[in-house]
UniProtKB/Swiss-Prot annotation:
The gene is TYRDC-3. Homodimer. The keyword Glycosyltransferase does not apply. One of its GO terms (biological process) is carboxylic acid metabolic process. Belongs to the group II decarboxylase family. This is Tyrosine decarboxylase 3. It comes from Petroselinum crispum. Keywords: Decarboxylase, Lyase, Pyridoxal phosphate. GO terms for cellular component: cytoplasm. The lineage of its organism: Eukaryota, Viridiplantae, Streptophyta, Embryophyta, Tracheophyta. It catalyses: L-tyrosine + H(+) = tyramine + CO2. It comes from the Eukaryota. SUPFAM superfamilies: PLP-dependent transferases. It is an enzyme of class 4 (lyase). The keyword Nucleus does not apply.
Length: 516
């Protein structure tokens, strides 16, 4: 056997030591290169086709089969980003991106994300990074106050907020908490009797969460909505469904109401729905993923009336609040319900701070153990722009949507299909624009072709939905770089493609585009 003396006497070369991949000056140099690259990208982002034009499998065909054995320079890597990666990106930050919902970025959000990534802490409990936990406590309370949430949702009122990754995670956590709370009362064997309620406009995240939580698919109630009610969840239909389930020996568990549905941004009637839900002891979650951010503006706060009777509430700051993905804000009235369902306390995580019960361990408020320092970027956004400018940011997009809605109304070939509440307009080519094409299936097909034609052009990007059997084009405004000129240009693109699509066989001679 060798001795310690023999080991220390061995001559070691520098190659036997780990390489230094975080040398401060080299980090500074490469960091400047990266900032310059991104700044140049944003300067010319409008010049790229909004939606990627590549075909499936394009990247595997142009990248090597194996990872490089020797190091490559950042300059070389960035060159490949420019020539190989950017062509395969759909540019969500383009001012001509009007699809889905916005993923609004900002300098403050990016820099906060950079700092969080640079610190690279893993804040699963208070002890491992007190600032990460406590800043999250602070910013969720700040945001909650901006929304005028009831004090019972704030840490100062016995509730509290947590930053999840996405709405899917937030809904899953609250559904699991509701499930376990109910089963502790009714017995674990009754999981097959639990029923979840929503509307047919509710985000699919709830259905996925219900599957994961073990809810019988037969007990998932997506209650039908109607055009006459603007696709809102009807309280009477909800109560009828609950009573039917009770009569059949089932256990009503959970209601998800929505403020700003994905398809049309309609708002469910929270006061009436929560009244019904509380009558039958359901957990109520309010999903305001998109439209919740608008409710920091006094003129939109009315849409949260009734939230005081909910058990949980969430919104995505990474949609319409200048904060980078991912950042879903979840507030709960009773944190102990989450903790009872999600807590783990193995020996290797035990510590004096946690045992005092005076700190928050966010690992017990989420599915994962490890977690990112998300609070930094939200803190940067709140401080860099302030409540006043954030409100004006929201109002600017709403104003542009009103303008676009007016443009649609002036062209007699088109119609707005659902009321515009926030910054998204749902519209279509209407049947009267086509001679002999009054069948809805044919009208839907024309609108589908219009969407495909516009998106294939790369000039703008829009998405679709189906409302009451009607194929609808969704025009969602929310990009940080978007201004009124982009909205006007987008409408011109839509009109031009409609002109090409509606040839003389379908377009009445008497219809003249009054805007041309």
């Amino acid at each position: 056997m060798g001795s310690i003396d023999n080991l220390t006497a061995q001559k070691l070369t520098s190659s036997q030591f780990p390489m230094n991949t975080l040398e401060p000056e080299e980090f500074r140099r490469q960091g400047h290169l990266m900032i310059d690259f991104l700044a140049d990208y944003y300067r010319k982002v409008e010049n790229y086709p909004v939606r990627s034009q590549v075909s499936p499998g394009y990247l595997r065909e142009i990248l090597p089969e194996s990872a490089p054995y020797n190091p490559e320079s950042l300059e070389t890597i960035l060159q490949d980003v420019q020539t190989k990666i950017i062509p395969g990106i759909t540019h969500w930050q383009s001012p001509n991106f009007f699809a889905y919902f916005p993923s609004s970025g900002s300098t403050a959000g990016f820099l906060g994300e950079m700092l969080s990534t640079g610190f690279n802490v893993v804040g699963f409990n208070w002890m491992v990074s007190p600032a990460a936990t406590e800043l999250e406590n602070v910013v969720t309370d700040w945001f909650g106050k901006m929304l005028q949430l009831p004090k019972s949702f704030l840490f100062s009122g016995g509730g509290g907020g947590v930053l999840q990754g996405t709405t899917c995670e937030a809904i899953l956590c609250t559904l699991v908490a509701a499930r376990d709370k109910n089963l502790r009362q009714h017995g674990m064997d009754n999981i097959g009797k639990l029923v979840v309620y929503c509307s047919d406009q509710t985000h699919s995240a709830l259905q996925k969460a219900a599957k994961i939580a073990g809810i019988d698919p037969k007990n998932f109630r997506a209650i039908e909505t109607t055009k006459s009610s603007n696709f809102k969840l009807c309280p009477k239909r909800l109560e009828s469904a609950i009573l039917y389930d009770l009569q059949n020996g089932l256990i009503p568990l959970y209601l998800c109401a929505t403020v700003g549905t994905t398809s049309s941004t309609t708002v469910d009637p929270l006061p009436a729905l929560t009244e019904v839900a509380k009558k039958y002891d359901l957990w109520v979650h309010v999903d305001a993923a998109y439209a919740g951010s608008a409710c920091i503006c006094p003129e939109f706060r009315q849409y949260l009336d009734g939230v005081e009777n909910a058990d949980s509430f969430s919104l995505n700051a990474h949609k319409w609040f200048l904060t980078t993905l991912d950042c879903c804000c979840l507030w709960v009235r009773d944190p102990s319900a989450l903790i009872k369902s999600l807590s783990t306390y193995p020996e290797f995580l035990k510590n004096n701070a946690s045992e005092t019960n005076k700190v928050v361990d966010y690992k017990d408020w989420q599915i994962m153990l490890s977690r990112r320092f998300r609070a930094l970027k939200l803190w940067f956004v709140l401080r860099s722009y302030g409540v006043g400018q954030l409100r004006e940011f929201i109002r600017g997009h709403v104003g542009m949507a009103k303008y676009f809605e007016g443009l649609v109304g002036l062209d007699k070939r088109f119609e707005v299909v659902a009321p515009r509440l926030f910054s998204m307009v749902c519209f279509r080519i209407k049947p009267s624009a086509m001679i002999g094409k009054n069948d809805e299936n044919e009208v839907n097909e024309i609108n589908r072709k219009l969407l495909e034609s516009v998106n294939d052009s790369g000039r703008i990007y829009v998405s679709h939905t189906v409302l009451g059997g009607i194929y609808v084009i969704r025009f969602a405004i929310g990009g940080t770089l978007t201004d009124i000129n982009h909205v006007s240009a987008a409408w011109k693109v839509l009109q031009d493609h409609a002109d090409a699509l509606l040839d003389d066989a379908f377009l009445p001679k008497k219809i003249v585009n009054i805007l041309s």
